[in-house]
């Protein structure tokens, strides 16, 4: 599921403080 994948990426990026992923 693409939405779940996006949420996972956002979650990981948020915890590591690295915002390499955005809409």
UniProtKB/Swiss-Prot annotation:
Tissues in which the UniProt entry reports expression: Expressed by the venom gland.
UniProt EC number: 3.1.1.4
One annotated Gene Ontology cellular component of this protein: extracellular region
Keywords noted in UniProt: Calcium, Disulfide bond, Hydrolase, Lipid degradation, Lipid metabolism, Metal-binding, Secreted, Toxin
Presence of the UniProt keyword Ribosomal protein in the record: no
GO molecular function term, any single one: phospholipase A2 activity
Localization annotation: Secreted
Post-translation changes: Contains 7 disulfide bonds.
Main location per the UniProt record: secreted
Cofactor remark: Binds 1 Ca(2+) ion.
Reaction(s) catalysed by this chain's protein: a 1,2-diacyl-sn-glycero-3-phosphocholine + H2O = a 1-acyl-sn-glycero-3-phosphocholine + a fatty acid + H(+)
Cofactors required: Ca(2+)
One GO-annotated biological process of the protein: lipid catabolic process
Recorded superkingdom: Eukaryota
Record-stated family: Belongs to the phospholipase A2 family. Group II subfamily.
Role played: Exhibits moderate hydrolytic activities and prefers the anionic micelles (dPPC with deoxycholate) to the zwitterionic micelles (dPPC with Triton X-100). PLA2 catalyzes the calcium-dependent hydrolysis of the 2-acyl groups in 3-sn-phosphoglycerides.
Protein name: Acidic phospholipase A2 Ts-A2
């Amino acid at each position: 599921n693409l939405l779940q994948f996006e949420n996972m990426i956002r979650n990981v990026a948020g915890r590591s403080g690295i915002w390499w992923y955005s809409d």
